[in-house]
């Protein structure tokens, strides 16, 4: 091979490598400033936006017409991600996704909501919006704009274009069953050639498979520079919801499921470092099964030490099971239409399915009754030093305040 050909070969390989680096970088950066600037690009102020209805079509501005066109045009090109081999994708309906979005009933959704339920949601959303606007409550990421959120931090926002819904899932807050509901609604997973109709029939391993859901972090690869604009179109039109839980009880639940049971992944990634750093164990078994047989388990105190250690997040962000809700769901950047709570799960689930107008189509799966109870807090924290409890509250204070959970005074004083 001549020197000229060799030079050209290296030039081509170098160019391909640089292009791959650019793609990887922008996928992480989130294309923060590469989108069309229309009416949806401007920040929204004032009262929450009303649910779009038939009368709103007459009020659309020229910019809104562009938004509507782009929404339909881009939605029409949506291709489902690859799913597990035994589960084939649902073929697009005639007319593609555009028909699904265009044919959706955008009429007001709260006709069957009782006055008490309406007041409760209004109070929860008012508390959330109030503290997002209140300068007295400060926490990381509070002041940043939606455009500044990296794509990697948008992976918890699941989109259902068929019913106009966006769900931000929070681990340890009934997210497995809500993911099942989203799979049924979106028809994103087939079993023997037909979409699942019963949420409980969906195998757990498919529920948590990222390829079973369309999430915001996938938009950049599909739509490039238009991804942020399309996200804003959907955030304005769709019903956005999340479910939360008392932050300390959520931590206890995460500890119970990940460290009190044999979990090989969490043992290797988290338990081994915790046991070495906070329990002074230098020689540890290779597997969780061996460790459990030898009586080597992470204590709740070790777990709290790990959370409070300033070096923990210098190595990597908190795992999603104990990461703060404000970091998972960005409630000060996204105006949620419905805030559900695990403490009122049954009532809230029924109300939300009515709001989405799918209550005749499916029921929310019955909840697991061996749930970590808030009454256990004092027992779990009894051996945790007061100073640690106070530091832990500061770490999760934003979640307590934003979602209306009372400060656990009994745990924060002698």
From Swiss-Prot:
TM segment ranges: 6-26
Membrane-related topology note: Single-pass type II membrane protein
Chain positions recorded as 3'-phosphoadenylyl sulfate binding sites: 171-177, 245-253
Enzyme Commission no: 2.8.2.5
Localization annotation: Golgi apparatus membrane
Signal peptide: none
InterPro entries (UniProt xref): Carb_sulfotrans_8-10 (IPR018011), Sulfotransferase (IPR005331)
Cytoplasmic side: 1-5
Primary site of residence: Golgi
Keywords: Carbohydrate metabolism, Glycoprotein, Golgi apparatus, Membrane, Signal-anchor, Transferase, Transmembrane, Transmembrane helix
GO BP, sorted A to Z: carbohydrate biosynthetic process; chondroitin sulfate proteoglycan biosynthetic process; dermatan sulfate proteoglycan biosynthetic process; proteoglycan biosynthetic process
Gene Ontology MF terms in the entry: 3'-phosphoadenosine 5'-phosphosulfate binding; chondroitin 4-sulfotransferase activity; sulfotransferase activity
Biased composition (Basic and acidic residues): 99-125
Region called Disordered, residue ranges: 80-125
A GO cellular component entry from the record: membrane
Expression by tissue: Widely expressed. Expressed a high level in spinal chord, heart, spleen, thyroid, pituitary gland, adrenal gland, peripheral blood leukocytes, thymus, lung, small intestine, fetal kidney, fetal spleen and fetal lung.
Catalytic activity: chondroitin beta-D-glucuronate + n 3'-phosphoadenylyl sulfate = chondroitin 4'-sulfate + n adenosine 3',5'-bisphosphate + n H(+)
Keyword Nucleotide-binding on entry: no
Lumenal side: 27-414
Glycosylation sites per record: 134, 209, 280, 370
Pfam families: Sulfotransfer_2 (PF03567)
UniProt record similarity statement: Belongs to the sulfotransferase 2 family.
Function field: Catalyzes the transfer of sulfate to position 4 of the N-acetylgalactosamine (GalNAc) residue of chondroitin and desulfated dermatan sulfate. Chondroitin sulfate constitutes the predominant proteoglycan present in cartilage and is distributed on the surfaces of many cells and extracellular matrices. Activity toward partially desulfated dermatan sulfate is however lower. Does not form 4, 6-di-O-sulfated GalNAc when chondroitin sulfate C is used as an acceptor.
Name listed for the protein in its UniProt record: Carbohydrate sulfotransferase 12
Species the sequence originates in: Homo sapiens (Human)
Gene designation: CHST12
């Amino acid at each position: 091979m001549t020197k000229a050909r060799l030079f050209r070969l290296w030039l081509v390989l170098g160019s391909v490598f640089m292009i791959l680096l650019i793609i990887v970088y922008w996928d992480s950066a989130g294309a923060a400033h590469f989108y069309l600037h229309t009416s949806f690009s401007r920040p929204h102020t004032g009262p929450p936006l009303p649910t779009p209805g038939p009368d709103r079509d007459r009020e659309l501005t020229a910019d809104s017409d562009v938004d509507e066109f782009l929404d339909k045009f881009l939605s029409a090109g949506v291709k489902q991600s690859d799913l597990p081999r035994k589960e084939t994708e649902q073929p697009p309906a005639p007319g593609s996704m555009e028909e699904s979005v265009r044919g959706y009933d955008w009429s007001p959704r709260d006709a069957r909501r009782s006055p008490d339920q309406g007041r409760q949601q209004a109070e929860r959303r008012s508390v959330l919006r109030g503290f997002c606007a209140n300068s007295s409550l400060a926490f990381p990421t509070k002041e940043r704009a939606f455009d500044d959120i990296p794509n990697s931090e948008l992976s918890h926002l699941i989109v259902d274009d068929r019913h106009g819904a966006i769900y931000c899932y929070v681990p340890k807050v009934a997210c497995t069953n809500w993911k099942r509901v989203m799979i049924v609604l979106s028809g994103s997973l087939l079993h023997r050639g037909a979409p699942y109709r019963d949420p409980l029939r969906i195998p757990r391993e498919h529920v948590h498979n990222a390829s079973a859901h369309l999430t915001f972090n996938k938009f950049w690869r599909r739509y490039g520079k238009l991804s942020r604009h399309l996200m804003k179109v959907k955030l304005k039109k769709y019903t956005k919801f999340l479910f939360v839980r008392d932050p300390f009880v959520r931590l206890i639940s995460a500890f119970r499921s990940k460290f009190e049971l044999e979990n090989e992944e969490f043992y290797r990634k988290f338990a081994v470092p915790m046991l070495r750093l906070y329990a002074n164990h230098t020689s540890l078994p290779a597997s969780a099964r061996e460790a459990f047989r030898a009586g080597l388990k992470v204590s709740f105190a070790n777990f709290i030490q790990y959370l409070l250690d300033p070096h923990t997040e210098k190595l990597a962000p908190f795992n999603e099971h104990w990461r703060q809700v404000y970091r998972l769901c960005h409630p000060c950047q996204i105006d949620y239409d419905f805030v559900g709570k695990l403490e009122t799960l049954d009532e809230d689930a029924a109300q939300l399915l009515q709001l989405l107008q799918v209550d005749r189509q499916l029921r929310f799966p019955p909840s697991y009754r061996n749930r970590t109870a808030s009454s256990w807090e004092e027992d779990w924290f009894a051996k945790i030093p007061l100073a640690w409890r106070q530091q832990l509250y500061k770490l999760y204070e934003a979640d307590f305040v934003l979602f209306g959970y009372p400060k656990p005074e009994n745990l924060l004083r002698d």
